[in-house]
Amino acid sequence: MSHKILELYSGIGGMHCAWKESGLDGEIVAAVDINTVANSVYKHNFPETNLLNRNIQQLTPQVIKKWNVDTILMSPPCQPFTRNGKYLDDNDPRTNSFLYIIGILDQLDNVDYILMENVKGFENSTVRNLFIDKLKECNFIYQEFLLCPSTVGVPNSRLRYYCTARRNNLTWPFKRGDEIITRLPKDFGVPHSLESIIEEDVDEKFLVPDKILRCAKVFDICYKTSKRSCCFTKAYTHYADGTGSIFTDKPREVVQKCYEEANQNEIGSEKFVELFKELKLRYFTPKEVLMIMCFPKSYNLPTNISMKQCYRLLGNSVNVKVISELLKILFE
C-alpha cells in the first residue's frame, strides 16, 4: 500500500528523510512550516515536494481531506515544555497551532497513522493529555516513547518524546500498553565511533574562540574514538555549557595533561586560554552534525545560509534514524 503523507512543522525535512530511510512506500503530499529559512533548506533538498509557507492554523479540515492523506508526521514547537520556555505548556501561544490540529482531528477521518515528536517534558504536560484524550476519542490506539539516538546505535544523546498512533480498526502487533517505552525491541548494539563522520582539513573558522575557551572547564570534549556526543542545541557555538560537544584531534592523554596544567592557573586567565588553544578545539561542522543526526550523505545545506542559521535549524531538527525505526513499527 502506498501512503500519502502530510508533514507538519516540516523544518528542514528530517521527517521526510526518515520516511525515505524507512523504505516504506509513500509520498509527502504536502509539507507545511512558517519558518522561511527552514523552508529554503527544505526546498533545496526536496524541490519536487509541495511545500507551503504558512501558519498551520490556516489549514482547514477540507483542505487536508482534499489531499487525501492517510498519515501525519509532525514535530510541534517544543519551547512551551522546556525550562527556558518556563514550562508555560498550553498557556504558551506557540502551542496554538498544535492545539488547533488536536481540535480538528475528529474531522480528519481519512488519517489512519500519526507520528509526533517533541522534547522530554512533553509527557507531563496538559497539551499531552489533550492530545492523548483526542486520540482515544477518535478511535486511535497509541504508544508513547522516550528515546535517545544512542539506543539505535547512534553516538549522540538527544532524549525526545515520541508518540505513534493508528486507527483501532487496524491490527497493530506492536502495542505494548500505557507505559512509556524507553528501548526498542530490536538490538542495535553499541553506538559506532565518531570517526566515520569527522571531516578532514576543517576551516579554522570552526576553532573555539578565546572568549569561549575561558570556559573550557565545562566543555564536553569528543575524539574520533568517542562513541557518544552531547545534544546539539540551537545555541551551539554561542554558549559553552550544555549546547553540544566540542571536538579535538589530539589524544585523550594530551587533553588530560592540558587540564592538569590549566588547573594550576586562574580559570579564564591568558595562560589558561593559551594552554587550551594548543588542543585546537573546534566545533563540529554543520555537515558533521547532520551526519550525527543521521541525515543522508546526499543532504546538504545551501551556501547562502549562515553558520548561525545552520546551527539553529539543526538544533530544532529531529534524529532521522530514530524516526525511521518508529515508522517501521507504526506501519508494522
Swiss-Prot record:
It is found in: Cytoplasm; Nucleus. It catalyses: cytidine(38) in tRNA + S-adenosyl-L-methionine = 5-methylcytidine(38) in tRNA + S-adenosyl-L-homocysteine + H(+); a 2'-deoxycytidine in DNA + S-adenosyl-L-methionine = a 5-methyl-2'-deoxycytidine in DNA + S-adenosyl-L-homocysteine + H(+). Its main location: cytoplasm. The lineage of its organism: Eukaryota, Metazoa, Ecdysozoa, Arthropoda, Hexapoda. It comes from Spodoptera frugiperda (Fall armyworm). InterPro entries: C5-MTase, C5_MeTfrase, C5_meth_CS, SAM-dependent_MTases_sf. One of its GO terms (molecular function) is DNA (cytosine-5-)-methyltransferase activity. The active site is at C78. Its EC number is 2.1.1.204, 2.1.1.37. Belongs to the class I-like SAM-binding methyltransferase superfamily. C5-methyltransferase family. This is tRNA (cytosine(38)-C(5))-methyltransferase. It is an enzyme of class 2 (transferase). GO terms for cellular component: cytoplasm; nucleus. Pfam families: DNA_methylase. Keywords: Cytoplasm, DNA-binding, Methyltransferase, Nucleus, RNA-binding, S-adenosyl-L-methionine, Transferase, tRNA processing. It comes from the Eukaryota. Specifically methylates cytosine 38 in the anticodon loop of tRNA(Asp). Also has DNA (cytosine-5)-methyltransferase activity. Shows affinity for both tRNA(Asp) and DNA substrates. SUPFAM superfamilies: S-adenosyl-L-methionine-dependent methyltransferases. Residues 3-332 form the SAM-dependent MTase C5-type domain. NCBIfam families: dcm.
